[in-house]
Amino acid sequence: MSITRRAAIAAISMLSVLSLAACGGSASNSSTGAASGAASSSASAGAEKATGKVTVLAAASLQGAFEEIEKTVEQDNPGLDISFDFQGSQDLVASLANGNSADVLATANNSTMKEASDQKLVGTQTEFATNVLTLIVPKGNPKKITGLASSLDGANLVTCAAEVPCGEATKKLTNALGVTLNPVSEEQKVTDVRGKVESGEADAGIVYTTDAAAAKDKVDKIDIPDSGVVNHYPIAQTANPENAAGAKVFIDAVTGKTGQEVLARYGFGAPGNATAGASAGASSSAGSSTAPSQAATSGESASPQAAKSTAETTAP
């Protein structure tokens, strides 16, 4: 065979190889495109909206914020109906333990959530907010109370009961400050403490900073040292939810950017933060004590999501 003919055959063979490679590459690209399209279609299908009823058991201090988050969630999921039971955290755990049905549990401290976890009533918990205590008095501060000291002598002070998260925090705070209180009443819900001060039935009450904000111009707020006493708020899906998909949607909303912004507006601190406070609402009395709790301003609202963390099951 001549050199010219061998060269021609070699050239033809090379062209055939290149042609096959090109076809293979085209087929591969086509396959990749199809897979990508299928993945896109699958992702789109996975974005289905939650429907049905979701029952949320939540600490009383969360009422305003959670009801606002509810509106956004239901607007985004037209077929979803969220209902709440706002009570003291210990009562919520007892309700679950007694067999009452619910999809989500949100408590005002880790110790009550731990009780639920120990009884296998909930799944994984996620911390979504923090809160600290403050002192409130009726508008105008008629008793001229200045803090947790002698100015409370003879005053009708109302606190939360020791078994309630705000009462547990109050006990820790007074122990840290070396202060002895003599409340005339101990309530099962922090909102009941606030209500008695708003109505003038009590001269002073120890509540969360978020409750002081919720009271708006009905009370004056007297800042007190928090002494590192911070309540950490965890949320969890119950162990036997009737609407797991709906529960997940609500929990994601609470821990997500929008929910965290709402919580910050209501005075809650970011998850894991050492301080929390009200950005609006009750005014601080001029006679307030030194070392006040830091307020959570609207400028913080973009940061809580970055600080989101899974709650430890030990008490704060």
Question: Each PLM stretch: what is its role?
Answer:
Residues 132:
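PIN/NYN-family metal-dependent endoribonuclease catalytic core
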Residues 1-21:
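Sec-dependent bacterial lipoprotein signal peptides
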Residues 77-84:
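A generic structural motif
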Residues 86-93, 101-116, 122:
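Ligand-binding clamshell of periplasmic/extracellular solute-binding protein-like
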Residues 2, 16, 24-62, 67-71, ...:
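Exported/periplasmic ABC-transporter solute-binding proteins
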Residues 79, 101-102, 202:
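Short, high-confidence coil segments that cap the C-terminus of an alpha-helix
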